[in-house]
Amino acid sequence: MAAGVLPQNEDPYSTLVNSSGHAAHMDENSGRPAPKYTKVGERLRHVIPGHMACSMACGGRACKYENPARWSEQEQAIKGVYSSWVTDNILAMARPSSELLEKYRIIEQFLGQGIKTIINLQRPGEHASCGSALEQESGFTYLPEAFMEAGIYFYNFGWKDYGVASLTAILDMVKVMTFALQEGKVAVHCHAGLGRTGVLIACYLVFATRMTADQAIIFVRAKRPNSIQTRGQLLCVREFTQFLAPLRNIFSCCDPKAHAVTLAQYLIRQRHLLHGYEARLLKYVPKIIHLVCKLLLDLAENRPVVMKSMLEGPVLSAEIEKTVSEMVTLQLDQELLRQNSDVPDPFNPTAEVAEFENQDVILSTEQEFDPLWKRRDIECLQPLTHLKRQLSYSDSDLKRAKAILEQGETPWTVPAQELLDHSLQHQKPTSHCYMPPTPELGFNKEALVQNTFSFWTPSKCGGLEGLKDEGSLLLCRKDIPKEVQRSRTFSVGVSCSHNPGEPVPPNFTSIHKDPEQVTHCRCEAPGGWVPGPVHEMVRSPCSPLNCGSSPKAQFPHGQETQDSTDLSEAVPHAGLQPELSAEARRILAAKALANLNEFVEKEEVKRKVEMWQKELNSREEAWERICGERDPFILCSLMWSWVEQLKEPVITKEDVDMLVDRQADAAEALFLLEKGQYQTILCVLHCIVSLQTLPMEVEEACLLHAIKAFTKVNFDSENGPIVYDTLKKIFKHTLEEKRKMAKDSLS
């Protein structure tokens, strides 16, 4: 983004870093990031002719943004270009030119730094009066072919200078960035690499980490000073955040809540978020149904589950948490210094109240700085890196937190463990989906000062009593398994048996109490994952599919932290029971699909399902972590709960009436439905077929439960027999046809 007519008081990068001038870009009344220009200044930038703006703003042909001599080495992450690393993998930069590419060997620098993609947000012919002359072939100051010939991907999204793009266009750009980051590092540029570039990177951070808009703006400005310049650009990031909120909602009755939708509406939302192969694969099938059916078959066949690395998100979350915390704290400290008023006695209650009432600079939207993963998921705060902040808050900051508490909000400064322990004591599920009440928190000022910014250091984890059910795998460890081997066996009992000659499964509470044994937080995550650099996953309590055995995980080398220990040294390997036959495993998986959970405590399953509902609503990483859930009853209950919470049944009364009236042939009946309907139904029926030959009563139970979930009609209701007879005939014929096709393909 061209910087336009820069304010006379704009500080250079070095000044911003040394004097922390970032706070100057915050609105003093609301504490939110403020635009860099006045309203009049913004208006002028839209009416001044381009050649005049270039001459007045950056020197015309002597454009400072294309002159490396104007920038320090610190401001040239890529030598020869005004550039900054916003994250370890995303580079914000001014536009390069053919002259600079050759003189500073920028393409070689890109390859050396691992940059595999360059994203250009300019329009051809833009800023023709700035810096180097434009290349006639491309309309830019360089030829894109120069990068592409070197194996670097090139994308161009034309974005008007000082303008904003549509939300759907930004979403497309963000998805391209997401794909590009899977290949390597990404460089983004416009003209100066400040406005449009900053907006796109901030929107990507919102998309990838679910942080708030203001957090993203603060973070980008901290890494790339003077970024995101106009009111429209600030509003663009905030509206993009609001635009994503309903799209991410999986379970409408769980926090963060959204309006219930139909299957067709959900598939439209899903298409907005998915990209690449996954978008094509799941065009007409909900992701949760496809994934659960796949995991169920993996469990039945005892196949390994391959998990891709999700390292970028958690590491980035930790970096963002640290940077935003420091920036907001810095702003508060500078405001207090500017007031230059006498500090009342902090131990005098009267003076304390008076100071609070006279506090005229309060972050009225402080919840905007509260990280989403803290505000919604207090129990999952630990970042991958063990960041130990040696900071404390002043008395006025403590009163601000007290005010937020009185308004019913969760202060982001409250020690995480204290919030968690208190909230777990007050959680009472009130509906089918998990909806924890806002806890009434009690804490003293001394505890707050002592624990401020010490988020989930290893010593903060405590025991597993309050964490094992709602921990976060990817926010608790840096070692991400590439493959998780399902080696737990099926069991037909509720309790775990133990062979005398095998080690006894450990007591996790005692392990955490022994600092010599464990120095790294190993909080059990949903589905039995144990975060930390472990080589042996441990799960408790036992379920029919994994009782008495232990899965194996392989981790990449070289990622262990200094204070991490091998769990295999501290935790004995759980004993293995003789595995059930393949047929027995398939039958048990089918019973889970039919909701015949006679071997599992229903309350335990319900609790786990509610927890997963909350996880999937709140965190993108939950899709990866759920692959580690080894209890088919939990997986199937989760899938059916999603089907049942839709605004309308998958198969409506009108659909059943149509099938009855047309007396449709069973072979063609499903194709009379909408494509999303029959593809969703076929996904479940294919899962049943893949379980191979099942006892008649088990298969019958699977079909009956599927009909009940898809129609929301009970068999004993008024039209129940007609609905069940019609659909059962169609479903059974589909199963027979699929089995016949499978048999023919093998012969």
Swiss-Prot record:
Secretion signal span: none
GO BP annotations, alphabetical order: cilium assembly; smoothened signaling pathway
Top-level taxon: Eukaryota
Ranges in coiled-coil conformation: none
Region span, Disordered: 1-36, 549-570
EC number: 3.1.3.-
InterPro entries tied to this protein: Dual-sp_phosphatase_cat-dom, Prot-tyrosine_phosphatase-like, PTP, PTPDC1_PTP, Tyr_Pase_AS, Tyr_Pase_cat, Tyr_Pase_dom, TYR_PHOSPHATASE_DUAL_dom
A cellular component term, taken from the record's GO annotations: nucleoplasm
Keyword entries, A-Z: Cilium biogenesis/degradation, Hydrolase, Phosphoprotein, Protein phosphatase
SUPFAM superfamilies: (Phosphotyrosine protein) phosphatases II
Pfam family, one: DSPc
Domain Tyrosine-protein phosphatase: 82-253
Entry keyword Aminoacyl-tRNA synthetase: no
PROSITE patterns: TYR_PHOSPHATASE_1 (PS00383), TYR_PHOSPHATASE_2 (PS50056), TYR_PHOSPHATASE_DUAL (PS50054)
Composition skew (Polar residues), residue ranges: 11-21
Family (UniProt): Belongs to the protein-tyrosine phosphatase family. Non-receptor class PTPDC1 subfamily.
Described purpose of this protein according to its UniProt entry: May play roles in cilia formation and/or maintenance.
Name this protein carries in UniProt: Protein tyrosine phosphatase domain-containing protein 1
